[in-house]
A protein has these predicted regions:
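N-terminal interaction/assembly modules
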Residues: 1-117, 121-138
């Protein structure tokens, strides 16, 4: 199920922010626990590889979309959710951008603070077609 694969990707990227590498043991445990099928594992590999490959660029785009908040003040949980969603939006055209935004908000309801959903929605809306594209210039 894509929802569980996306949640697994979020968890791997959260861990990546600390370790600076994708942990294969964690990945295998998530695949088994969430009973991910072949398509889900393919998605998981694609999104995690995309975030790692474009990590600095994605972070710059996120920081460019901030209004007044200092980048280092973003909760790592929120940043992980944002990285997964933004990778989908920019590098995985088969996923509708609004789906990425909605799923990111849903993840924030489970893993982050009460206000995170609105924050995440505000940041990602900059990258929707017709959004302000703050991140594109930075």
């Amino acid at each position: 199920m894509r929802k569980l694969a996306r949640e697994s990707a979020f968890q791997l990227i959260y861990e990546y922010q600390f370790l600076k590498e994708l942990n294969e043991d964690t990945k295998q445990a998530l695949i088994l626990r969430n009973k991910l099928d072949e398509d889900d594992v393919r998605y998981l590999d694609e999104v995690c590889a995309g975030v790692v490959r474009h990590y600095d660029e994605l972070n710059q785009k996120l920081e460019g979309a901030l209004d007044r908040q200092r980048p280092e003040r973003i909760y790592r949980c929120d940043r992980s959710i944002l990285l997964v969603a933004l990778c989908e939006m920019l590098y995985m055209p088969e996923i509708p951008p609004k789906v990425s935004v909605n799923e990111a908000i849903e993840l924030s309801k489970i893993y982050s603070t009460e206000k995170s959903g609105g924050f995440i929605n505000g940041i990602l809306s900059n990258f929707l077609p017709g959004g302000s594209d703050h991140g594109e210039d930075h």
